[in-house]
Amino acid sequence: MIYLDTSSLTKAYVSESGSDEVRQLLERTSESIYISSLSLVEFRCALARRTRALTLTDAESQRIWASFEGDVDDGVFDVLPVDNDDHINARRLIDAVAPLPLKALDALHLAIVRRARALLGTSFVTSDAQQAAAASALGISTQTIALKI
């Protein structure tokens, strides 16, 4: 299985550095593609941020969101819920990777990946350099695309 964090998920819908690579990965894989319910919120936020910054029009943002929702509804992505244990484990991961910097929501993604990996086996795809470093420190198989530092 492949787990996309929101930085990589966004590249599938918004043209930016690494978009072609993410799109090719999604087109070529025969594995299940997982995201978390956290990604639903983060992706909506990413579109709103781009609309405020005028890199997307409101119409473009709405079209992209509708396309994404359609893909979720059509089962392109399996959406993993975030549960209380993920929050507890995210707090533990912050300590486990110290002194590496790890943002709160990145820690939560990594906790979800670790839970999914234990159940399903997984590869983690991210475009966030700090999150990739933390994932590697935790022994999570990580693929990076157009890293943002």
Indicate residue ranges for each PLM-predicted region.
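Active-site neighborhoods of divalent-metal-dependent phosphate/nucleic-acid chemistry enzymes
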Residues: 74-130
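Well-ordered alpha-helical segments within folded domains of soluble proteins
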Residues: 42-44
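Short, well-structured N-terminal submotif of metal-dependent ribonuclease cores
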Residues: 1-40, 50-63
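Helix-adjacent hinge/juxtasegments
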Residues: 49, 53-83
